[in-house]
């Protein structure tokens, strides 16, 4: 009897699991009928897994992540799949000779098949259209004034100068050490509060406490999209979306320096890029009545990542209009880039060109004319905890399942790993990869590993759900901690900022608190957007 014909692995890069993964959360949600029963939660018993990257929103774009041992050149990269007893090495190359990924079919239980990111605590949940939660009310701020209330009389907890010392010294600088911050002195005694200070959120909760908090995260739903084409024109369609090349393994050994001389670097559009996102929302007449936050993905990456990343400063604009908070991307000053820095950045864009279909490039033809300003942005709606978020996220490319379902794919470039760099890669870079992909609902990440000279050494496909599983197994980080932390931040923000006022949210040294500072102006992109929503026929006000 003739054996059944074997399926050519080159015909399908992602295999059947791609369709299962991309539709899993929806099938799970539609079959349950109860949003709360399908909600994702981060609990201590199941050790959730977790979190951040640049779009035109600042997610990192095609920037190469640089050396795994470097502190910050470019974006981060890569993941491998983990099981309880078997672990595939990051250094293994299963591509073989075929030049195509050997994506074997994954045998999963029926429940796992229904869930895009597995049955862990970071699964997506469906939630009702109207929130049942009221706007959070913040407790009264903590005060250093201990003269009133409990302990103000007698020999109580604090010393009061009567009848001998108290059981504990009064909070404040240690004697003889100066400073103006309660009880710290030494390292923190020179901390000076910004005169624009409005409020702060101290990062006092432990990761164990956050891990026990149940935080729902709704599966992102795409509402619209837009493209930026050559010349900078913005078109409200998917013209700029590229198709993933399933035979990327054929590019192993390619020089990522090709085309560097004609590279067009990405322009810093500032708030103008945010205006393009808001314009796409208006073009589709999408209501913001029940939306608490509008932002680029990059700002959510920063917030979720701060649960673990306590050494990278950042800030963002915070502007509340008509009950919706607009988070504007702010870029902090950077050190001047060397030629090597620019090349590493280009290697990421070059890999994106190699990994996507280009009808205009003949087989074997080198990459040329790479324009970092050409991009495609998806606009999605999701819900984190009690707050609905509308978010713009730049997407590298897409692929299509056997059943015609389109899904997005993230492309990353990073230095080849060795025994010294694997640990940091899993602790830090995979955390950023997971956040960037998870919050936008991207199921797959394809990583190009390169050597120090910019030559492509190997490629590897990672699934977003398995990144979280692996990190949890090794106790590196938990996705649920990042979600719980972000929920705390959004609750604090929404309950603190006032209507028609402008702020800056910053996270700076010594990285012990988030600070909300008063700002003096609102970007024209937001002002014009609000005006056009209320008066579609009238021209926007002149720039400030």
UniProtKB/Swiss-Prot annotation:
User: What's an example GO cellular component term for this entry?
Assistant: nucleus
| Record keywords, A-Z | Cytoplasm, Hydrolase, Magnesium, Metal-binding, Nuclease, Nucleotide-binding, Nucleus, Phosphoprotein, RNA-binding
- Residues recorded as binding Mg(2+) 1, renumbered to this chain, are 352, 396, 410-411
Give the compositionally biased regions (Low complexity): 27-52
Query: What reactions does this protein catalyze?
Result: a 5'-end NAD(+)-phospho-ribonucleoside in mRNA + H2O = a 5'-end phospho-ribonucleoside in mRNA + NAD(+) + H(+)
Locate the compositionally biased regions of type Gly residues. Answer: 53-64, 149-166, 175-186
Q: What InterPro entries does this protein's entry cite?
A: RAI1, RAI1-like_fam
- Class of enzymatic activity (EC top level): hydrolase
Q: Which cofactor does it need?
A: Mg(2+)
Q: Where is the composition biased (Acidic residues)?
A: 103-114
Cell compartment(s), UniProt: Cytoplasm; Nucleus
EC number(s) on file = 3.6.1.-
Bias (Basic and acidic residues) occurs at 1-10, 78-91
* Stretches the record annotates as Disordered: 1-121, 136-188
The free-text note explaining how the cofactor binds reads:
Binds 2 magnesium ions.
One example of a Gene Ontology biological process annotation: nuclear-transcribed mRNA catabolic process
The record's principal subcellular location, in a coarse class, is: cytoplasm
Q: Which residues bind Mg(2+) 2?
A: 352, 394, 396
Chain sites annotated for binding substrate: 272, 296-298, 377, 394, 412, 436
Q: What Pfam families does the annotation carry?
A: RAI1
**Domain of life where this protein originates:** Eukaryota
Molecular-function GO terms, alphabetical:
3'-5'-RNA exonuclease activity; 5'-3' RNA exonuclease activity; hydrolase activity; metal ion binding; nucleotide binding; RNA binding; RNA NAD+-cap (NAD+-forming) hydrolase activity
Q: Which residues carry this modification: Phosphoserine?
A: 119
Does the entry feature the keyword Endoplasmic reticulum, yes or no? no
Family listed: Belongs to the DXO/Dom3Z family.
Q: What name does the UniProt record give this protein?
A: NAD-capped RNA hydrolase DXO1
């Amino acid at each position: 009897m003739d054996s059944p014909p074997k399926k050519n692995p080159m015909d399908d890069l992602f295999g059947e699991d791609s369709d299962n993964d991309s539709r899993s959360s929806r099938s799970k949600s539609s079959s349950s009928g109860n949003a709360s029963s399908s909600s994702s939660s981060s609990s201590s018993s199941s050790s959730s897994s977790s979190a951040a990257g640049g779009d035109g929103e600042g997610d990192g774009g095609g920037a190469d992540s640089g050396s795994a041992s470097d502190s910050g050149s470019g974006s981060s990269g890569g993941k491998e799949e983990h099981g309880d007893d078997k672990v595939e090495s990051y250094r293994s190359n299963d591509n073989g000779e075929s030049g195509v990924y050997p994506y074997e079919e994954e045998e999963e239980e029926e429940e796992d098949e229904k869930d895009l990111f597995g049955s862990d605590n970071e699964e997506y949940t469906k939630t009702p259209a109207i929130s049942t939660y009221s706007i959070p009310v913040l407790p009264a701020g903590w005060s250093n004034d201990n003269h009133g209330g409990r302990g103000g009389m007698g020999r109580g907890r604090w010393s009061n100068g009567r009848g001998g010392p108290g059981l504990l010294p009064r909070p404040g600088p240690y004697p003889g050490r100066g400073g103006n911050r309660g009880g710290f002195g030494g390292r923190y005694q020179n901390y000076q509060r910004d005169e624009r200070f409005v409020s702060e959120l101290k990062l006092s909760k432990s990761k164990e406490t956050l891990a026990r908090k149940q935080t729902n995260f709704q599966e992102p739903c795409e509402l619209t999209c837009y493209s930026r084409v050559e010349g900078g024109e913005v078109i409200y369609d998917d013209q700029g979306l590229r198709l993933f090349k399933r035979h990327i393994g054929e590019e192993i050994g390619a020089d990522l320096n090709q085309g560097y001389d004609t590279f067009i670097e990405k322009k810093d559009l500032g708030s103008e890029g945010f205006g393009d996102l808001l314009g796409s929302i208006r073009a589709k007449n999408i209501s913001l009545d029940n939306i608490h936050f509008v932002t680029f993905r990059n700002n959510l990456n920063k917030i979720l990542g701060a649960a673990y990343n306590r050494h990278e400063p950042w800030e963002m604009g915070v502007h509340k209009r008509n009950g919706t908070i607009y988070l504007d991307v702010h870029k902090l000053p950077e050190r001047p880039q060397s030629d090597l820095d620019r090349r590493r950045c280009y290697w990421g864009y070059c890999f994106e060109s190699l990994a996507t279909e280009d009808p205009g490039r003949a087989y074997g033809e080198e990459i040329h004319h790479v324009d970092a300003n050409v991009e495609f942005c998806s606009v999605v709606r999701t819900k984190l905890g009690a707050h609905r978020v509308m978010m713009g996220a730049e997407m590298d490319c897409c692929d299509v399942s056997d059943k015609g379902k389109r899904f997005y794919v993230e492309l990353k470039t990073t230095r080849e790993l060795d025994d010294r760099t694997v640990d940091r890669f899993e602790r830090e870079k995979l955390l950023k990869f997971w956040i960037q992909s998870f919050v936008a609902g991207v199921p797959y990440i394809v990583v190009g590993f390169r050597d120090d000279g910019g030559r492509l050494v190997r490629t590897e496909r990672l699934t977003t759900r398995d990144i979280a599983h692996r990190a949890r197994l090794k106790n590196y980080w938990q996705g649920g901690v990042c979600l719980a932390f972000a929920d705390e931040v959004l609750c604090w923000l929404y309950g603190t900022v006032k209507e028609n006022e402008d702020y800056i949210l910053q996270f700076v040294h010594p990285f012990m608190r988030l600070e909300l500072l008063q700002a003096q102006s609102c970007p024209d992109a937001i002002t014009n957007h609000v005006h056009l929503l209320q008066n579609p026929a009238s021209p926007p006000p002149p720039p400030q």
